[in-house]
A protein has these predicted regions:
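Short hydrophobic/aromatic helix or loop-helix immediately within or flanking a transmembrane segment
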Residues: 33-55, 59-85
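Transmembrane helices and adjacent periplasmic/lumenal helix-loop junctions
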Residues: 150, 184-208
Length: 269
């Protein structure tokens, strides 16, 4: 998939080079072509950090600026660049490729777990010997994702590969009931792309589904208690899970709050 996407970008670059109305300036090579648009802002965050003095429109509203982008991609890629003494554009592509390969492995495990859950009622991410059909189906699902229409972004300097990897790891934590481990993973996800609110909503809906299932199970196993008592017991048993969902939602406000405190404007983000 990476080779195919690189070929597509190379062809697109050649087409753009011959267009009389397009001038890439210093970004006229493949490395520069893969680090355009949003990737330029991530590089600017690495080199200049975020602006304290915001650009304003004629009506006084905040204009488009680097605060629209989360810092995690720039921080990790910048750390790689500083550690190995390489150019930032190379480091961010290396990070994206590594995150994409890791994402493929995590997705494979998630697909295996979902198939085991469907057939056995247990979310087990291990691929068992003799389950070639499940393994094959999971690999085909990963391939479909790797060759999807949006997948070329996974070899650019964008943060999508890193963000989706962290989302997939968050899903794994939720399905395995690792809610303490979920918190740092979800925080990193919220600092990679603005996914804190939908991720928190997912954790909240999962909490609701688990709580309702616990309540139904209690009513089936022992109907001697009142419905209210069983509902309270189910809620109390899943309270930590609910707290995790609320904390994950709160992570969505970390970057906007940082922007507001740093610039003195509540609408900086």
């Amino acid at each position: 998939a990476c080779i195919l996407h690189l070929g597509m970008f190379s062809i697109a670059l050649e087409q753009h080079r011959t267009h009389p109305l397009i001038d890439f300036g210093q970004h006229n090579d493949l490395l520069g072509f893969l680090n355009r648009w949003d990737a330029l802002f991530y590089e600017r965050i690495y080199t200049e950090w975020y602006p304290q003095n915001l650009p304003l429109r004629a009506d006084g509203s905040v204009d488009y600026n680097a605060w629209a982008f989360m810092p995690l991609q720039s921080l990790i890629a910048g750390g790689i660049a500083n550690t190995f003494g390489i150019e930032y554009r190379v480091a961010t592509l290396a990070l994206t490729l590594a995150a994409g390969f890791a994402l493929a492995y995590v997705l494979y495990r998630l697909f295996i777990g979902c198939l085991n859950w469907r057939d056995r009622g247990v979310f087990d991410t291990r691929a068992f010997v003799g389950d070639e059909s499940r393994n094959r189906l999971a690999l085909w699902a990963v391939a479909a994702y790797a060759f999807s229409m949006a997948s070329p972004v996974f070899i650019t300097g964008y943060a999508e590969a890193l963000s989706i990897l962290l989302i997939a790891l968050s899903v794994w934590c939720v399905l395995r009931g690792r809610y303490v481990l979920l918190l740092p993973v979800a925080l990193l996800a919220a600092l990679s792309r603005p996914v804190g609110v939908p991720l928190g909503a997912f954790v909240g809906l999962w909490w609701l589904w688990c709580t309702v299932n616990d309540y139904r199970r209690r009513r089936i196993e022992d109907a001697s208690h009142s419905a209210l008592s069983d509902a309270w017991a189910a809620f109390r048993g899943r309270f930590g899970q609910l707290l995790s969902a609320l904390l994950v939602c709160s992570f969505a406000f970390v970057h906007p709050l940082h922007a507001a405190l740093y610039t003195g404007r509540i609408d900086a983000y």
